[in-house]
Structures are given as C-alpha cells and as structure tokens.
Regions:
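Dinucleotide-binding Rossmann-like beta1-alpha1 core, especially the glycine-rich loop
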Residues: 1-67, 203
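Helix-loop-beta segment of a Rossmann-like dinucleotide-binding subdomain
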Residues: 45-47, 65-104, 125-129, 143, ...
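C-terminal catalytic lobe of FAD-dependent flavoproteins
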Residues: 99, 158-161, 166-213, 219-325
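Short, surface-exposed charged micro-motifs
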Residues: 107, 116, 144, 202-204, ...
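General small-molecule cofactor/ligand-binding pocket signal
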Residues: 107-109, 256
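A conserved short coil-to-beta-strand element within the FAD-binding core of flavoproteins
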Residues: 110-126
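Core beta-strand elements of the Rossmann-like FAD/NAD(P) dinucleotide-binding domain
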Residues: 136-147, 151
Length: 325
C-alpha cells in the first residue's frame, strides 16, 4: 500500500529516512541485541523496503552523529538507517474528495452530521437523516440511499446505536499526542526512533522546517471523543524519551505546540494495552444493511475502501435493487 501511495500521489508522498540509534553502556551494545536488530532490519527490507528501492544501512558512531549531533555520545555505539514514507495527510484527504466530486459525481459535505437512520417496511436502511450546521435553523432532511457506509472513526458505535438500538461498544479509543519543539534543540537531519525509558515503546523525532515533532503516545482514552487533550503527563512522557537519548535537556518551556487525536482501534479482549492492539481493519454489515468500517490506519486507506466497497456491492445485490434505482 505504501508503494501504491508513492506511485499514485508522488506530489503528496515522499520517502523519509529513519535513524535507529543503538546505545550501550560504555559504548558497547550487547551482541544479541545488535544481532536481533540487524535481523529485524533485513526483515523490514524483505517485506517492504525493496518495494521502494531502498535498503537499510549500518552506520558507525561518526556517521550517526552527522545525522543527529545531539545524541548522547557517552552511550551511542552506532545506528541503523532505514526508509519509510511520509504523507501530507490533509492534502491527501482533500485530493481524494476532489477526485470523487469532480471525476465521479460524488456530493461532498462537511459539517453535516447524521442524526438518524430511516428504514423501509422490511427493516432495511433506505435513508439517512442529516442536520447541516451553519444554515441558520439547522433544518433536518433525509437523504435517500441504496446503501449506507458508517466510516465515522471513533464515532462508529454512535451510528451503530442508531441502527441497532444499543451501543455495541466495539471501539477502544486510543489517544495519541505529539509535541513540537524548536529544531535547534534537537538538530536531527532525518527522522529518529528513540526508546521510551521504562516502557516497551519507541517514539519518533521528526524534523519539519524549523521545528521537530516528537510522538506519539498510545494510551487508553475514556473522555469526550470530540475533544481529546494533551495533558502534562503526556508531555512529560515524550520529553523523557527525548531527553533520554540526547545531550542537554528539553523542558516544557521549549514546547511550542501540541496536538492530540484518537485512534478507532477494534476492541479485543486479549490485550491489556492499546499499543498492543492490532491496527487491522474490520468491515461489518448489520441485518438492516449498514456497512461499518472500523480500525485500520492511513497507510491502508485504499485497501480499507476497497474492502468496504466490496461489502456495499454485496449489500446492494442482496437487495436486488441494483445501482440505477
């Protein structure tokens, strides 16, 4: 999917180098850890790196510091450099919407929440009640449909409740936050993966213009999904990871911006941490015909859409109504 994005939207997606510093006591890293990480890098190349024509490199001490001179010199041993990709997510979404509208006749409307579902005499969904905001009187009206897709992210259970009458509690929201600090505090030439002390996670340190983004967290969230917030504990978590790997100290006073979001992870009884939950997506179809897509991530958006459309086609054909009326 990453290769497809690079091919289909080269103006929005570009290859991004990632550096994984290896630290050790007294400048020595355990041979087992070094060997395991090397195997992981080759595994990454075989499953994805070769598709974009980029393979990992092993860098020595001096080569590593050339990419990020603020790394802890007393603990740094060497590093691995591998390649992934980055995308302008907002422009990608707008581009897809423009293509759907201009090339395929889709009607695109934001600030138009779905407040209800209508069903025919057999209990099959045949309309969505919407309430456009900003029209003055917030008038409701019904959009007649042959199929309805519920792709509401962390709000999918709210839509399913309109359909099923009860909340299925199928989503486990996971909060992720990023902080922004001045680039001069970090001086990384590429994206860098740094470990979180006392945790089994790592975070990314990504340069962007005159700033550096640090993130993300991955924690359970039970607050209002309309307004996730970055807390002081979130900021401290990311700063501790950054300061563990660099010389000098970045403080809360250096943080010039934060943002927070929620991942609509599919709930699983087998995992205690959101970080351990699968990012795989799931497509469901209710008895009334509502098609719901949950889980997933931006990289696999095309595959998610393809699977969803396949389910929509099955729904329409099962009702024997066709796509022409």
């Amino acid at each position: 999917e990453r290769r497809r994005m690079l091919r289909n939207a080269p103006h929005l997606v570009e290859i991004l180098p990632f550096l994984i510093p290896m630290f050790g006591k007294g400048g020595v890293i355990p041979a087992k850890i070094s060997r395991l990480l090397g195997i992981a890098m080759w595994g990454y190349d075989l499953t994805g790196g070769w598709r974009i024509g980029k393979f990992h490199k092993r860098l020595d001490y001096d080569e590593t510091l050339a990419y990020m001179p603020t790394l802890r010199r007393d603990r740094l041993v060497s590093s691995y450099l591998y390649y992934d990709a980055t995308v302008d997510d907002a422009r990608l979404v707008v581009t897809i919407l423009r293509t759907a509208s201009l090339d395929h006749g889709a009607v695109v409307a934001n600030r138009t929440p779905a407040v209800g579902l209508e069903k025919d005499s057999e209990g099959r969904i045949n309309g969505v009640v919407v309430r456009p905001r900003g029209t003055g009187d917030d008038e409701e009206f019904t959009v007649r449909t042959r199929a309805v897709v519920n792709a509401a992210g962390v709000w999918v259970d709210d839509i399913r409740e309109q359909d099923e009458g009860t909340n299925p509690d199928s989503i486990r929201p996971a909060k992720g936050i990023h902080i922004t600090v001045p680039w001069e505090k970090v001086r990384n030439q590429v994206a860098v993966v740094v470990p979180v002390p006392g945790d089994r996670r790592s975070v990314f340190v990504v340069p962007h213009g005159g700033l550096t983004y640090v993130g993300t967290t991955d924690t359970d969230y039970d607050g209002p999904v309309d307004d996730p917030q970055c807390t002081p504990d979130d900021i401290e978590y990311l700063l501790s990871a950054l300061n563990f790997s660099i010389e000098g100290t970045v403080t809360t006073d250096d943080v010039v911006g934060t943002w927070a979001g929620l991942r609509p992870l599919v709930k699983s009884a087998s995992s205690g941490r959101t970080a351990d939950l699968s990012r795989m997506h799931r497509v469901l179809r209710s008895e009334s015909g509502l098609v719901t897509i949950t889980g997933g991530k931006l990289t696999t958006y095309r595959e998610m859409a393809s699977d969803t459309v396949d389910e929509v086609i099955e729904e329409v054909l099962s009702r024997d109504i066709g796509f022409d009326g």
